[in-house]
Amino acid sequence: MMSELRIERWSMPAADLGPEDPLPPLRGEGDFLDLEKIPGVPDEKLKSWVDGNPPNILPYTRQNRFTRQRHPRDFRIAVLENEFLCATFLLELGGRLWSLVHKPSGRELLQVNPVFQPANLALRNAWFSGGVEWNIGIYGHSPFTCSALFAARVERSDGTPILRLYEWERIRQVPFQIDAYLPDGSPVLFVRVRIVNPHDGEVPMYWWSNIAVPETPDTRVLAPAGSTYRFDYRKFDVISVPKAEGIDVTYSSNRTRAGDLFFHIPDGHRPWISAPDGEGKGLVHVSTERLAGRKFFCWGMGLGGRHWQEFLSEPGHTYIELQAGLARTQMEYLSMPAGAEWSWLEGYGLMEADPDVVHGTDWTQAWQSVEDMLERLIPRAALDAEFERGADFVDRPPVELLQRGSGWGALERLRREASGEAPFCSEGLVFDAESLGEAQSPWLSLLHDGAFPAFKPDVEPHGLMVRAQWRALLEDAVSAGRGANWLAWLHLGVMRYYARDRDGARRAWEMSLEEADTPWAARNLAVLAWEDGRFDEAVELYVAACRLRPSLLPLAVECGRTLIDMGRPRDWLGLLAELPPSVRTVGRIGLLEAQAALAIGDFESVQRIFAEKPVVDDMREGEKSLSHLWFDFHEQRLSVTENIPIDDALRARVRREFPVPKQFDFRMTSDESTSSG
């Protein structure tokens, strides 16, 4: 058959993603790894990490109002197909490559999640497992992983259809594009990626293509390397492969805990990674040299890791991840020069190698056998030539726009036109006026009319902006009295906070509160008070904000966490009684109630909540709050009832006699002997 691109529907049970959180993510804790506290990280990687990480995820907001109730849903997909492969992309969910079927054998090369179930694993909170995710800009999954990208049909000179996925990334302020295509007769899916830095200065850059493949006991991950960086979220070290401490770490079935292996592929060597099963068959990923990093992630065989696999999907659908990135590890950023354009070509196909060699005891022979078969599948010279041919279509305008993404790229295009700046992208990326929506509407008014419009205070604000150019426009408008309303002051406070002008932010939010008594300004002022150690004021402001919007779950959760952190559990329990049942019955709220109850010695309430088996929809990756609460509860209960101190002996006894029930165990490391207290 001839290569084709078509639009279809993919049906699966899906949880509701819910609306975005209207609260700006001012507090960046938990967004990024605290790498400075992890031993073994090389100095140069640590420096690029510290220099490259933003203080928070602004201007993005969190996607944290999803549920775990699933219902049948049809997703819009793009399908690329030729005689060898059929590739399916979820257009509404970050352009995720969801399925890649090798047609002659009928083999699915990726792990296809049978459900869409968001969980709290990404910077914006919501993330889902399965397929191939395109991660740009910052560590912690793409800001677009649960959002629609622009999608367009482009055609090569020979008529081969190309699926172009693209967006404007707002933290690094760069456009990126993904051109996926399947030429006639190709046994490999090609994915050509381009990132452009349109600025006059350097930009910290990050890209990782994360590939989920089925996990089986006999699947082995191979790459052309004799050593790796190992990162288990507690330490960072170098180990030899395949064996470390007597264990063959290239099989996930041998690894007890979650962790990453970053392969040391020599400079100049062809970068690839593959996961053949016991028959020597599985996905192989290869690229041109720009995409130099390769990583193997697994959840581990521990109870917590197994629980996470089920939490993200359904029993029996476990996966591991093969990943490919610009840098050698994910603990670093590369400095992208001013005006630079970075491009590379990725290939995805079926590896068929000799299983006896692939799973043999000679590691070098094992990976060399895969490399030999890769050279037959897609020779290195052929991949390089295919990449060079991409210059012919990379700037070609779309034949058809299949889907629009956000309106932020169009707004940036209009701002640049108004200020006389050069365009940030070629005609190959269309950010049209039709993509502009409610989030961009007030900023468009500011740009064209010089005034910021107001909306009703009871409507959830959205459309955050932190760029200096927009702040200057808003500062000028407000100082001149053009739209100095509650919403303008609210946004200006966020901009000042982002620019580390805390006093200015406080004044702006106080002005917003004078204009309208909103939970939005009260909450932002509460964050400032908490950060400054003005706890009495923070409690008062948080309680006021919650009373103004008692049905807003993210506000209630943040309020509960903060009041407990400040040592005010009784204030939280008192406020909890005022919240509506739709909030009080949520699993996260139940966890916070139990933590507060334990803090005041109310063992009966803690026991009742555990008996209700709360499900915390937004359990964070690496979070141990449930298991810590379980251990702390039993330690304190036994200490009181038996009049004994909480010491190492009691902690050990609790872990023996009261193991964490499976539904509460999300631990990713083997530190069961430690306690939160």
Predicted regions and their residues:
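A contiguous, surface-exposed recognition patch within enzymatic or periplasmic domains that forms
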Residues: 2-46, 78, 85, 92, ...
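Extended, loop-rich substrate-binding clefts of extracytoplasmic carbohydrate-active enzymes
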Residues: 43-81, 129-188, 217, 303-332
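Acidic, contiguous internal or C-terminal segments within carbohydrate-active enzymes
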Residues: 67-69, 81, 87-105, 165-216, ...
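Short Pro-Gly-centered flexible turn/kink motifs
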Residues: 78-83, 89, 152, 193, ...
